[in-house]
Amino acid sequence: MESLLNRLYAALGLDAPEDEPLLIIDDGIQVYFNESDHTLEMCCPFMPLPDDILTLQHFLRLNYASAVTIGADADNTALVALYRLPQTSTEEEALTGFELFISNVKQLKEHYA
């Protein structure tokens, strides 16, 4: 069975990535992919990590209201949006999930970045 990442790329009309999978969308949205045997994870940095704790708490509260999870990157320099799909997802589910993820990232960038 072909990987979910390759099926998503095919659904988007793109060739499968040969090296580190990365898509750049519209206005500089960079989507990185991490694939395991069980999931396909999409990750997109969308703004610098806030300096004040109240702003950071606000973003963490958003995790309760959306399938898109907000976290910090490994260097603790940026907020990232994360979305996971099971490998058993169909091409349609992967495409719908990708579109939902991009829509959420655009909203986050529009309102907060």
UniProtKB/Swiss-Prot annotation:
Biological classification of the source: Bacteria, Pseudomonadati, Pseudomonadota, Gammaproteobacteria, Enterobacterales
Triggers of expression: Transcriptionally regulated by InvF and SicA. Also regulated by SirA.
InterPro entries: T3SS_chaperone (IPR013095)
SUPFAM superfamilies: Type III secretory system chaperone-like
Native source species: Salmonella dublin
Pfam family name, one: Chaperone_III
CDD domains: T3SC_IA_SigE-like
Keywords assigned: Chaperone, Cytoplasm, Virulence
Protein name: Chaperone protein SigE
Protein localization: Cytoplasm
Top-level taxon of origin: Bacteria
Main location group: cytoplasm
Similarity comment: Belongs to the IpgE/SigE chaperone family.
Role summary: Molecular chaperone required for SopB/SigD stabilization and secretion.
Subunit note: Homodimer or higher-order oligomers.
Cellular-component GO terms for this entry: cytoplasm
Disulfide bridge map: none
